[in-house]
Amino acid sequence: MTAAVAAPKISSARLIVCYAAILGTLPYLTLKASWVTGGDLGLRDPSFVDSGLMRFANLLTGGMDVVAVVLALAFTYSWGRRIPAPLVLFPIWIGTGLLAPIVLNLPVIVADLTKPELDEMPLENWVWAVVYGGFAWQGVLLLTAFVLYARDRWWFVVTGTVRPGSIGVTGGLGIAAALGAATAHVFWSFSTGGMSARGQDVVVAVLAVLAAIALATVSRGRFWPRLVLVWTGAGAMAGSGAWALFSAFGMSASGLGHVPMLAVQVVGGVLMMTSVLRRLPHAA
């Protein structure tokens, strides 16, 4: 008779990171639950969330935070290592792309929250602080949980050497798209939008350029730092670009002029990530 093998003990640090990340989702999920069920929590103008499109957007973004909760648990408990890699990597890649720019842009966002124009918005002032504070909290803790998980599951990516080959046409097109998107975001950062939106454009531009440089030099030096830069920059291109496309088509007709470049940006992010994944080291 075979004795059952005990699951490895989970460190206190990983449990703290996991449940702190989950705790960071609760204020946002509470707001979304209120709005999709007809509540007016944090709303100056309840009609702001009454349309079918806004209900869909709130369900979508609330669902994304539910996925974040599941990921935090998967990154911590042993069952998470049995999930097929694509089901883990795709959502956390998009999550990285959405959350990392917010974390990096947080000082500008905080400065923007002090503006008196906020008093004219349909949401109470404290809602903005809760939402963006929660995103930054999740960005730090969820990505920390992922790094610890990835270190255990794919340790050979850190210790191994890059697989021979070139970035190919896929990588070349991705780099071209990244540089084009970076140029567009720098141009957009000089628009008349709010400071936080303009700061976000600068952050996405910088991340895209760093990803392009990392992919172009992926065969030189250590692989994993370049993988991190491509992962983050390509994720920012795909994640922020996809969200901007949704906003342009669904919530802000004024952004339709950005649609062609945003589409190039999303495709470019996918191409860059595809290219770098082909160079992953093999497990020994």
Where on the chain are the PLM-derived regions?
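Membrane-interfacial, low-structure loops and terminal tails that flank and connect transmembrane helices
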Residues: 1-11, 152-171, 284
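Alpha-helical transmembrane segments of multi-pass integral membrane proteins
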Residues: 20-31, 94-105, 132-141, 166-189, ...
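C-terminal transmembrane-bundle signature of multipass membrane proteins
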Residues: 27-32, 182-192, 201-284
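Membrane interfacial helix motifs at helix-loop boundaries and amphipathic/re-entrant anchors
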Residues: 32-61, 105-133, 185-204, 240-265
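Hydrophobic cores of alpha-helical transmembrane segments in multi-pass inner/ER membrane proteins
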Residues: 61-71, 133-150, 204-215, 263-278
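Loop-to-transmembrane helix junctions at the membrane interface
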Residues: 74-95, 215-235
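Cytosolic juxtamembrane helix at the C-terminal end of the final transmembrane segment
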Residues: 76-81, 144-163, 215-225, 274-284
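Membrane-interface helix-loop-helix junctions at boundaries between adjacent transmembrane segments
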Residues: 79-153
